[in-house]
Amino acid sequence: MYSDTHFHYKLMTEEWGINGLETLETMAERNCFFGLDIGTKADDLFERQSVCEKTIAQIKDTKTADKVRNFLYFSAGIWPSLDEIKDRENRIEVLKKYIAEAEKGEQDTLHRKVIAIGEGGLDHHWNPGGADGRCESDFDEKVYQGERELFEMQLELARELKLPFIIHSRDAFEDTLDCLNNVGYHNGIVHCYSYGIEEARKCLDLGWYIAFGGAVTYNKKAKLEEFKELLRYVPSERFLC
């Protein structure tokens, strides 16, 4: 039995060409205990749920379909895109509205109620040519501050709703730590962890779980031993993958 704490089902199936029906059926066959579909936009929750529902409706075996409904859950959050940062006051209100509506719609077809906030946080990694829609030149001091504010708004929302938070942090550890300490809410996961042992210690001391993503499999050989030490350092009860 296993769990998957972070995937983007709509993105996987509609943009990456992954067979969603086969994926969900395989997860059910392997007795997946828990699967969390992650939000990245203030208003993407219902669309993501609808895509999952349509796939579940294609599952011919009712027991398999029930298994999928039982293990599938949803988060809602705002990844720090430039558009979301600039319109953060409005977008956080949209996020709150969607979360409230989802709670009213809890029914037997899906676990609609949001169980975590995220992913949200800070991203200062610049891909060549702004491949992910972000360029370093776009990030002046005003935008940097807006990104921090958007992150802290979501942390406050998680505290208000008593929900865990899924942190996205890339090349921005000190700023991330500052935001966490400003809000003082420490409950959740540091997703796709990409820092070192000292940073891991600080996260663990604050109470955060640490999740390792695909980087576990493709680290450069020169850094492999360093990465192995990091994996050994994180206690098994605080380790997610």
Feature map (PLM): residue ranges:
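Mid-domain alpha/beta scaffold segments of enzyme catalytic cores
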Residues: 1-241
